[in-house]
């Protein structure tokens, strides 16, 4: 496993379920094409599984 993940919001949260919107917000993403770095751990991976269709993930 890599130490960090680079997460980019690639699809809009308009029309998604409220739980998915909160997950995207919890990841620190607000705007389209915004990128954040998060630690690679089980909690982050779980959140990414819930919104995999909205984000792209790159291991760094």
From Swiss-Prot:
<protein>
    <recommendedName>
        <fullName>Large ribosomal subunit protein uL30</fullName>
    </recommendedName>
</protein>
<dbReference type="GO" id="GO:0003735">
    <property type="term" value="F:structural constituent of ribosome"/>
</dbReference>
<dbReference type="InterPro" id="IPR018038">
    <property type="entry name" value="Ribosomal_uL30_CS"/>
</dbReference>
<comment type="similarity">
    <text>Belongs to the universal ribosomal protein uL30 family.</text>
</comment>
<dbReference type="Pfam" id="PF00327">
    <property type="entry name" value="Ribosomal_L30"/>
</dbReference>
<dbReference type="GO" id="GO:0022625">
    <property type="term" value="C:cytosolic large ribosomal subunit"/>
</dbReference>
<comment type="subunit">
    <text>Part of the 50S ribosomal subunit.</text>
</comment>
<dbReference type="GO" id="GO:0006412">
    <property type="term" value="P:translation"/>
</dbReference>
<dbReference type="InterPro" id="IPR036919">
    <property type="entry name" value="Ribo_uL30_ferredoxin-like_sf"/>
</dbReference>
<dbReference type="InterPro" id="IPR005996">
    <property type="entry name" value="Ribosomal_uL30_bac-type"/>
</dbReference>
<dbReference type="InterPro" id="IPR016082">
    <property type="entry name" value="Ribosomal_uL30_ferredoxin-like"/>
</dbReference>
<keyword id="KW-0687">Ribonucleoprotein</keyword>
<keyword id="KW-0689">Ribosomal protein</keyword>
């Amino acid at each position: 496993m890599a130490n960090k993940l680079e997460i980019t919001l690639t699809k809009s949260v308009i029309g998604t379920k409220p739980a998915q919107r909160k997950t995207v917000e919890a990841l620190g993403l607000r705007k389209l094409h915004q990128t954040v770095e998060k630690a690679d751990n089980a909690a982050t991976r779980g959140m990414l599984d819930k919104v995999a269709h909205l984000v792209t993930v790159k291991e760094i």
